[in-house]
């Protein structure tokens, strides 16, 4: 019916299955020109052996796996892209991408009601249209001309012991203001497509690190927190 109504476009579907006997979906996959994989693109190698003509893409992926989902496409011509869940935040599946603190309601969104959460909070772009640091990292992976981006990870224990869900990323911010944390270690993340990066605090060089593909185009540098100006 799809091809009858519109013969000009390829037909696809997102295969959403967690079964160990993944191969039972081969007949369904053969009906499509493009085969979408929800969270299962790691099965690409064995699938390609069984069906070398299959053209694949990841139709849903976890936000924190940005590098590997880019690498699958970069390294294999039969994988043409990745769709993260999700690009933009939305209402529903409340708290699917939340991080939380020890002592708060635990577990994934499907385990229990996560009130007062009402947004999903798994978007690279948040509910009011602001980009999270993960969005800059993903953008840089897919576009080699993007400038470096500097962000800071919330220290574990600053507000509480951090817990993550399957669709969350560690709370990371474009901020160097952490009162009360003076002298204690804090992690800085720099996303960069150049071979190396230098980190300066109050105009003093504090670290230099490689940022090649081996490092996933990212430097994670731990330094003591000192108020002032951080730049790279």
Residue ranges and their predicted role:
Residues 1-16, 26-33, 43-231:
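Substrate-binding clefts and catalytic carboxylate motifs of secreted carbohydrate-active enzymes
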Residues 36-40:
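A general structural motif
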């Amino acid at each position: 019916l799809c091809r009858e109504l519109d013969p000009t476009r390829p037909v696809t579907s997102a295969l959403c299955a967690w079964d160990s006997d993944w191969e039972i979906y081969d007949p369904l996959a053969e009906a499509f020109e493009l085969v979408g994989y929800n969270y299962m693109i790691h099965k690409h190698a064995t699938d390609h052996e069984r069906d070398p003509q299959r053209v694949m893409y990841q139709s849903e992926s976890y936000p924190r796996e940005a590098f590997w989902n880019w690498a699958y496409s970069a390294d294999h011509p039969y994988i043409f892209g990745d769709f993260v869940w999700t690009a933009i935040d939305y209402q529903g599946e409340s708290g699917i991408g939340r991080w939380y603190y020890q002592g708060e309601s635990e577990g994934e969104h499907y385990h229990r009601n996560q009130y007062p959460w009402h947004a999903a909070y798994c978007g690279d772009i948040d509910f009011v249209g602001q980009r999270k640091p993960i969005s800059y990292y993903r953008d840089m992976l897919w576009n080699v001309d993007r400038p470096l981006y500097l962000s800071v990870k919330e220290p574990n224990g600053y507000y509480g012991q951090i817990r993550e869900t399957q669709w969350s990323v560690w709370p990371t911010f474009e901020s160097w203001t952490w009162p009360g944390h003076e002298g204690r270690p804090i992690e800085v993340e720099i996303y960069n497509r150049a071979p190396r990066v230098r980190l300066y605090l109050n105009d003093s060089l504090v670290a230099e690190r490689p940022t090649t593909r081996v490092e996933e185009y990212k430097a994670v540098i731990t330094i003591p927190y000192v108020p002032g100006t951080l730049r790279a």
